[in-house]
Swiss-Prot record:
Disulfide bonds join C33-C63, C40-C56, C48-C64. Keywords: Disulfide bond, Secreted, Signal, Toxin. The keyword DNA damage does not apply. It comes from Ornithorhynchus anatinus. Coiled coil: none annotated. GO terms for molecular function: toxin activity. It holds the Pfam family Defensin_3. Its main location: secreted. This is Ornithorhynchus venom defensin-like peptide A.
Length: 66
């Protein structure tokens, strides 16, 4: 009984039960840096506070906030 409940809970979380979407949360992918008001900076910048799950157009840069 507990295993069934845990499996149903997992399915509800991964597939956002009730939202009408069958797309799992982890398939949404990364957002552009500007979506989070971040700034694309060189990867060697030591003052960069990296924003996870974002991307920059230039692969030599990463999304930062200051």
């Amino acid at each position: 009984m507990r295993l069934t409940y845990l499996l149903l809970l997992l399915v509800a979380v991964l597939f956002q039960a009730g939202s009408g979407s069958a797309e799992p949360i982890f398939f949404y992918g990364r957002q552009p840096c500007s979506y989070y008001d971040g700034v694309c900076r060189d990867k060697s910048d030591v003052n960069c506070k990296y924003i996870a799950f974002t991307y920059c157009e230039n692969p030599n840069q990463r999304c930062c906030y200051y």
